[in-house]
Amino acid sequence: RVPSLLEERNESQADSLRSNPELLATHQRIERTEFDTLMSVAARYYRLVFFDSGNDESAERWLRMVDSSYQLVIPTLAAPEPAESAALLLDALRERDERSRDLADSAIVVVTESEPRGPAAAERVADGFRGTVREVLRIPFDPALKSGPLRFDSLRRATQDAWLRVAAAVASGF
């Protein structure tokens, strides 16, 4: 039954259980027990389970995702407003409970250059997180990140290398 719920595999060979992009989020909410069931099934079949939590940190599923996590990767763009949102999220986690504080302190922040402005803005944002999380990594601007489905082989070599550094940072936490 689980394979029938998964997105069709593509070149990445990754299975994906995702929301329906043709429906509003309000029609696809899952609650605590549903999340726990999904996590239980996923953990039975997969050694690594990744969640793209969205940005509704007040949602029950978001809190359960945090409670089920061993590593947080906090993405942000190289701009003040998204960086402030990421910083506020980390602050809220630190205030939530001891486990959430530990997750925030050991988080990896990924700062992506969404426009071809050069690395200065990304470096300023990255500097704001250094010393507050385990690691801060930058992803250079790459037009392939803005042009439809992501494919690793369509990224520039520098972007591929940057994402490999992110993966290595995540792996070093285990």
List the predicted regions and their residue ranges:
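Short acidic catalytic loops
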Residues: 47-57
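Conserved beta-strand segments of the P-loop GTPase G domain that flank and frequently precede/overlap
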Residues: 24-26, 50-52, 74-78, 108-113
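P-loop/Walker-type NTP enzyme "switch/lid" segment
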Residues: 1-44, 147-150
